[in-house]
Structures are given as C-alpha cells and as structure tokens.
A protein has these predicted regions:
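Short, functionally critical alpha-helical segments immediately adjacent to catalytic or ligand/cofactor-binding
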Residues: 291-307, 342-346, 369-375, 433
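A ligand-binding cleft/hinge motif common to bilobed small-molecule-binding domains
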Residues: 96-106, 155, 178-211, 381-382, ...
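Extracytoplasmic small-molecule ligand-binding "clamshell" domains
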Residues: 21-98, 102-105, 163-167
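Periplasmic-binding protein-like
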Residues: 38-42, 112-126, 196-234, 259-263, ...
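Substrate-binding/active-site groove segments that recognize
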Residues: 140, 145, 309-333, 339-351, ...
Length: 474
C-alpha cells in the first residue's frame, strides 16, 4: 500500500509527465522492470542480511515504484563499467553517486541533480591540518583523474599538476594517505562522511565551498532515453520538493552516526590485528549455520573482543561468552574452545531468531534476536508486551528499544512476568553489534578496490593565482 506521501508524489509526477508528452511508456515498461547499473559502495548500493541499501538504490527504487516497474540493479566494478552497461543497452539508468568528467558524452544524457556535493580535503590526524588552499602548496595530493574532482580542482584551485589514479574510488584515495603515499586526498565529501568511521585516523581538513557538484543519473541519448530523462527530471524535482531525497539521504547517514571515533579507532585496530587470527574459523562456523560471517564476527566482538579465553566476573566465558547453563543446554563442553564457543553462540542466536513470531520481519527480527541473546527471551517478550501497551509496535525494533529500558523502572517491571532487567544495556548491546556489523560490511565493500595501485606521487604545484579563493575550514 502506498503511503500518503507516495500518493502525492505519484499524482504530481504523472500530471507533470502528461504535460511534457510522456503519456506513452511502452518502450520503457514492456519488460516490466527498470534496470539500473551502479557501483557497490555505502553511498550507492550494497546488500546485507536485510536486503539492498544505499541512497542511490533507495531513490531508484522510489522511481521504479512511481513508474509501476520492478527495480533490477546491476552492480559494476567501477563507474566506467556502469556507463558501458548503459551504452550497451543493458541498463536504463546509470546511478553512480558521482559526476564523471567524461560523461555525459554525445551518447549519454544527465538528469537534473538529486544531490549537490562538495569536494573535501582529507588529511592524517597528527599531521599539520591544512586550513586553506595555500596550505596545500607543498603537499602531495591524490585525486581521481576520471572524476569531476580533477577538473574542478584545476578550475577552482588552479593546481597545475595533481597526482591521480584512473577510476580511483574514495577508498583508494583515502588509502593513499594511510600508506603515506600522499599527504592529502581530495574526495567526494558525501562519501568521506559515510566512510570516515572506517578511517578513524583520517580527518576532514576543509571543504571547497565553490565546488557545487551537481550529481544526477545518466541515461542514453535515444528516444526512450530522452523520455526517461524527462520522467526522471520530474520525479527528482517532485521528490526534492516533498523532502523525499533529504529523508533518504539522512537514512544513509544513520547507520554509524552513534559510533564514536574512539570505538571506531579501537575496532579498526582489532580488525587489522586480531580478526585475521580468527576470521577463517568465524567464516567456517558461519557457513555451517548459514549465517553471514560479518554478523557472527560482530556478535563475537561485542561479547569478547575476539578473545577466545575471555572470562567475565559473572562467569561467562569464551569467544561468545556463554553462561555455564547455556553451554550445557547447547552441548558445549569447553567454553574456551574457539569452535565450540562459536558453534554454541551461533546455534543459540539462531534458536532465538526462530522462536520469534513468524510475522516479525527483517531487519527487526535480527535486532530482536540480538536483544534476546543479551537479556533473555523472557525479558524481551516483557518489553514487547509493554511496547504494545504503550502504543508502540511490538514487531518493530525501534519501538521495542524505546521501552526495553523501562524494565529497570519499578512501576513498569513489577507487573511483568519476568521482572527487572537491564534493558538499557540490551539496547546498547544491539546498537554496538549493528555498528560492528555495518563496519565489517562496508570494509568488505571498499576492500574490493584494494587491487588498484597507487601511482608515484609528486608535489602538486599551486600557482600564485589561487590567492583570494574562498575556502571553508571546519
């Protein structure tokens, strides 16, 4: 069923479409699907246990819904390949999340922008922070030669030479700083904001306010492509005016918003130093139980920080910090045995996951099962009953998480079946695992770019003509 906002968008959209003569969509709708080529990254499109996500994916899905089409996404290795899929007629739209300097060409059209981005200058924490363009004069700078960034840097900043990597992702450019191959990188500010938690040692120096980069979609310069562009233009305009694009964009930034830099730094260090010792074991057990290894890794990190010999003051032990009672029920003889602990924890989590009512769906089902792993199924059910009494949805994790802490307040826990529980700790527990899981998923996405090599960086030359440029130091 469409929401009120979707009905309004659809109505305005089709009125506008008729006004521009787009009442016949036979060429676009005969297949019953809208095919979008894109690249996998946290901003555009990626998948986890609850399905596909990403701003570009969410926006394209809304567009397909308005057209009454099914959305089919074709992930490409990079932007060049995504545009090639468009050129070959294998895709209707290329949604890249960036502006390519070589596009659109004669064969491609660009829709009106759904996003205005800025370039961000990024540096390594501990180094001297550049605050204005003249501070870059003697620094080694990396950028993507085929992106809009190089053209704009030369246009707005006046850099005569810049070290660049063809088809370089934001991840590759950020890696060039971490490996000390470059002093600063000039990247898409939106993507850096999303990836910053994966790079806790990198900081934003300043943004280049002059670089108002319009980012839209690409379509083919054909009769059907021209129609699709007009439809997309009206959709984007309507969605922007009704706040849909802002809402979807905000959704993209929620995932790691409460992940502190300190936690991110520690977790990144553990990923580099400790996870490699146990990743194969986690992978093996995850495959045995048909779990995502990232989810099992996130749970085990929250439980023990990937320490198979961990022991708490309350007596829980091992990689998955099983109680003696739970271990006995699961047939775990030695809780500090890595495989026994991982298998026991995976089995326990999946049992909780299965015991939830059938009409609870993802992503709420996994979040509720995680809460039960921490606080117990009985206390979780008490919280769900309380949530419903208070007017919330007991099937929705966000609603239940609001009322779990009430189990620490006497007037609320006394009438419950299982009594007092540390509900606030359970909420934090789930939130932490969500952060760790999301970080591991994003690490997997961006690590696919690691095969790209960095060039030999040289000093970028900044002419005196840059004096007077306006920069924003944050």
């Amino acid at each position: 069923m469409k929401t009120y906002l979707q009905v309004i968008i659809s109505a305005v959209f089709f009125i506008s479409a008729n006004q521009i003569g787009c009442d016949s969509l036979s060429d676009l709708t005969k297949s019953g699907e809208l095919v979008v080529s894109t690249v996998n990254n946290p901003h555009t499109h990626y998948s986890d246990h609850s399905g596909s996500k990403g701003f570009e994916y969410d926006l394209a899905k809304r567009f397909a819904h308005v057209l009454d089409l099914e959305l089919r996404v074709i992930p490409a290795k990079n932007s060049t390949e995504a545009l090639q899929l468009l050129d070959n007629g294998e895709a209707d739209i290329a949604a890249l999340g960036e502006k390519i300097s070589s596009a659109p060409n004669f064969f491609q059209l660009e829709t009106q922008p759904h996003t205005i981005a800025n370039l961000a200058v990024v540096y390594m924490a501990g180094n001297s922070r550049p605050r204005k363009v003249s501070d870059l004069e003697t620094l080694r700078i990396s950028a993507d030669i085929q992106s809009w960034s190089t053209d704009l840097i030369k246009s707005f900043v006046g850099i005569d030479f810049i070290s660049s990597i063809p088809n370089a992702s934001t991840k590759v450019l950020l890696d060039s700083i971490q490996t000390r191959a470059a002093d600063v990188a000039i990247v898409n500010g939106i993507e850096f904001r999303l990836l910053q938690k994966l790079y806790p040692q990198l900081k934003l120096a300043f943004v280049i306010e002059e670089t108002q980069i319009p980012i839209g979609w690409y379509v083919n310069n054909t009769s059907s492509g021209i129609v699709l562009k007009k439809l997309a233009d009206h959709f984007i305009d309507t969605a922007s005016k009704n706040g849909v694009t802002d809402s979807l964009r905000s959704k993209s930034f929620v995932s790691l918003s409460d992940f502190s830099n300190g936690d991110a730094f520690t977790f990144d260090k553990r990923i580099q130093e400790r996870l490699p010792l146990y990743k194969d074991s986690i992978n093996q057990v995850a495959e045995e139980f048909d779990l995502e290894w990232e989810l099992l890794a996130a749970i085990s990190y929250q439980e023990s920080h990937w320490n198979p010999w961990a022991t708490s003051p309350t007596g829980v032990r091992g990689m998955m910090m099983l109680t003696q009672r739970t271990a006995a029920e699961l047939g775990v003889l030695e809780r500090t045995d890595l495989y026994q602990s991982l298998r026991g924890g995976a089995e326990y989590f999946l049992d909780l996951h299965r015991r939830l009512p059938d009409d609870i769906f993802e992503p709420h089902r996994t979040s509720l099962a995680l809460a039960a792993y921490n606080v117990g199924m009985g206390h979780l059910e008490d919280a769900r009953v309380l949530t419903e009494k208070m007017g919330g949805d007991p099937h929705n994790w966000m609603d239940v998480s609001n009322y779990l802490p009430y189990l620490q307040i006497k007037k609320y826990y006394e009438p419950t079946k299982h009594g007092y529980a540390r509900g606030a700790e359970a909420v934090t527990y789930v939130k932490n695992i969500q952060n760790y899981y999301q970080t591991l998923i994003w690490h997997k996405l961006v690590s696919k770019d690691s095969t790209q090599t960095s060039p030999d960086f040289q000093v970028a030359l900044l002419p005196n003509s840059i004096t007077g440029k306006h920069w924003s130091a944050l």
